C-alpha cells in the first residue's frame, strides 16, 4: 500500500 503518510507504519 502507500507509505507516504506520517506514522503509517
UniProtKB/Swiss-Prot annotation:
Q: What induces it?
A: Expressed at high levels equally in exponential and stationary phase in rich medium (at protein level). More protein is seen when cells are grown in bortezomib, an inhibitor of the ClpP protease (at protein level).
Lineage top rank: taxon = Bacteria
Q: Cite any additional comment in the entry.
A: This gene overlaps yhgO on the same strand in another reading frame.
Q: What is this protein called?
A: Protein YhgP
Tell me the gene name: yhgP
Amino acid at each position: 500500500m502507500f507509505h507516504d503518510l506520517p506514522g503509517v507504519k
